[in-house]
């Protein structure tokens, strides 16, 4: 583990700005969390422990959590199972106004496999990717269709909104998240212990999906 110190100079202090790979500590206790983020209570300076894990390490953790008979892991699996019911209730919901706007296109893509409500996980993922590639192609012109968040057209904020709704429609629990993103290229210019100033140009949004057994 390593540490990250955050000094909030001018951003809203209602929430804390928490590293994505937050390590175990007081901030992960239930009383410090809500469904939207981590409470800030007006604080503007704080230190976090963070965990840097590769994709392979994450898969090892997932396998351990799924197969281990350790009492602590068994307790975790029981708790996660209950939380998963909460996730499946709230994070698969799509507002009716969004369905009115996009359901025809979603169903058209799903029709190659059958009913949108009876897709395999792989088919659901493929349908979501096909739709998003039509809306936000890496090259060429996007298809002409009405999308949510028109005032933020072409931004990560619109992409994350559309992606979250699309994934949910195809049965994949998803949520919209936003914050500040520091790219690998930007971070490469700083040594350990150096201060990096993060401003509005780094403000981004992204979509997070729920992985059964491990979390967001």
Where are the language model's segments positioned?
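Helix-boundary/low-complexity linker signature
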Residues: 1-216
